[in-house]
Curated annotation (Swiss-Prot):
Keywords: DNA-binding, Transcription, Transcription regulation. Residues 128-190 form the HTH cro/C1-type domain. It comes from Methanopyrus kandleri (strain AV19 / DSM 6324 / JCM 9639 / NBRC 100938). InterPro entries: Arc_TR_HTH (IPR020886). This is Putative HTH-type transcriptional regulatory protein MK1005. One of its GO terms (molecular function) is DNA-binding transcription factor activity. Disulfide bonds: none annotated. Residues 139-158 bind DNA. Signal peptide: none annotated. The lineage of its organism: Archaea, Methanobacteriati, Methanobacteriota, Methanomada group, Methanopyri.
Length: 325
């Protein structure tokens, strides 16, 4: 059922013209870049109570570095089905039902927040004056920021102020969970100019660095599925995706660099230039566009890139055979 909910959500987002990256075996399921540039890190659950604290921390950490909003999309929690138009929270992560999230993505934010004692909305000062309550109660409401129950707002026919979902500002970066090799990579990125570095466990990337340019890195080789996911997230977020290895490694879907070469690079701008020059997809694209070559075997002979990797790049370019372009 969760897989079906993921698939339905992904289909609806793509149909709406938003950029979507589907992730498997990670702390989040979907990355969304809306048409107007807003970014969301989405975890899909049937029951929101299934969100564990450590997963919530990773959602917040990734969102912090990628300047995104973490969201859990679920159908219910222990008290019953999630109400439409209401924001719930679990471990500081907003929880929405699918329809409310779909409306949020389309620019219609929710207006109620679930809290102890019920569901509340915040109304404007002029709306407070319109309520049929005593002067004492009006003064109290102003002191409380105009927060009233959703039922009272509906009774008074006031809409309330939209709930703003924000990118987490203060998070545990997870540096204490880095391996020795990951810590060395993080130190080099900081020397190059990154102000912040962090570590996540359940994602196609394990290291994050931020200072103008966001770096998504993995200090180890991984499978093709992880590499494709790393590349897709980096592309959707405008980040640098890179795999850092102890020694030179086989080609992959993402630019790679060995630790010795990384130590010689001066700053993040030089790193970006280095990765762009060695980006395997760009190398394939240049051969297709400049030389008209679409044969995976011939491209492999010229570049040393694996044929399976080349076929995936050609598929993304809409080329399914070996004809000349």
């Amino acid at each position: 059922m969760r897989a079906e909910l993921c698939a339905d959500l992904e289909e609806a987002l793509r149909a709406g013209g938003h950029e979507v990256v589907r992730i498997e075996r990670a702390c989040f399921d979907i990355f969304v870049r809306t048409r107007d540039g807003r970014a969301y890190i989405v975890k899909v659950l049937i029951n929101a109570d299934g969100l564990r604290r450590e997963v919530a921390e990773e959602l917040r950490r990734i969102s912090h570095f990628l300047e995104a909003v973490p969201v859990v999309v679920a159908l219910k929690r222990h008290t019953g089905p999630l109400e439409k138009g209401v924001v719930y929270h679990r471990y500081e992560v907003p929880v929405l039902d699918p329809l409310t999230f779909a409306r949020l993505v389309e620019g219609e934010p929710p207006k109620a927040v679930a809290d102890r004692g019920g569901q509340y909305v915040v109304i404007r000062a002029d709306e407070v004056d319109e309520l049929d309550v005593s002067r004492v109660r009006r003064r109290q409401l102003r002191r409380e920021g105009g927060r009233i129950t959703l039922a009272r707002a509906e009774e008074a026919d006031v809409e309330g102020v939209p709930v703003e979902l924000k990118t987490p500002e203060h998070v545990d970066t997870g540096r204490d969970r880095m391996t020795r090799f990951e810590r060395r990579v993080a130190e080099l990125l900081e020397r190059m100019g990154a102000e912040r570095t962090g570590k996540v466990r359940r994602a196609p990337f394990k290291l994050l660095a931020k200072d103008g340019e966001t770096v998504l890195a993995r200090a180890e080789e991984g499978g093709d599925r992880e590499s494709i996911a790393l590349r897709d997230v980096a592309s959707a977020t405008g980040s640098m995706g890179v795999i850092v290895t102890r020694e030179r490694c086989k080609d992959t879907y993402v630019p790679t660099i060995d630790i010795g070469t990384l130590e010689e690079i001066k700053d993040l701008e030089d790193l970006k230039e280095y990765l762009q020059e060695r980006d395997p997809e760009e190398r394939v694209r240049r051969l297709v566009e400049e030389a008209g070559i679409t044969s995976p075997r011939e491209i492999a002979q010229r570049t040393g890139i694996r044929e399976s990797v080349i076929r995936e790049f050609l598929r993304r370019m809409g080329i399914t055979d070996e004809r000349k372009v």
